[in-house]
Amino acid sequence: MQTAYWVMVMVMVWITAPLSEGGKPNDVIRGLVPDDLTPQLILRSLISRRRSDKDVGKRMECYWKSCSRPLSRRHDLG
């Protein structure tokens, strides 16, 4: 438990140290995100993941001899 506490403290120091040197919060946050991570890349990843979900098809889920209907997504939520 003490290790988790010290890891949390060190992460907080790592994040807030640039702020004490005059850095802006936005610059500090941008420094934590990889350079190749863009909103377009995130959106493309989500779209491709959604397409692969549709290809799987519906299947029955059975646990301990009780089967449930396949879960269907609500398409009206957009």
Swiss-Prot record:
The keyword Disulfide bond applies. The modification 4-hydroxyproline is found at residue 70. Residues 1-22 form the signal peptide. The modification D-tryptophan is found at residue 64. One of its GO terms (molecular function) is toxin activity. The modification 4-carboxyglutamate is found at residue 61. GO terms for cellular component: extracellular region. The keyword Repeat does not apply. It is found in: Secreted. Expressed by the venom duct. Keywords: Cleavage on pair of basic residues, D-amino acid, Disulfide bond, G-protein coupled receptor impairing toxin, Gamma-carboxyglutamic acid, Hydroxylation, Secreted, Signal, Toxin. Disulfide bonds join 62-67. It comes from the Eukaryota. Residues 23-59, 71-78 form a propeptide. Coiled coil: none annotated. Belongs to the conotoxin C superfamily. Consomatin family. Moderately activates human somatostatin receptors (SSTR) with a preferential activation of SSTR1 and SSTR4. In vivo, does not cause behavioral changes in mice within a few minutes of intracranial injection, but causes a progressive loss of movement thereafter. Four to five hours after injection, mice recover, even with the highest dose tested. Shows antinociception and antihyperalgesia activities in two mouse models of acute pain, most probably by acting outside the central nervous system. The cysteine framework is C-C. This peptide is an evolutionarily optimized stable analog of somatostatin. In addition, it adopts nearly identical conformations as in the somatostatin drug analog Octreotide. As this drug, it contains a D-Trp at the same position, whose synthesis is a common strategy used for enhancing the metabolic stability of compounds in drug design. This is Consomatin Nc1.
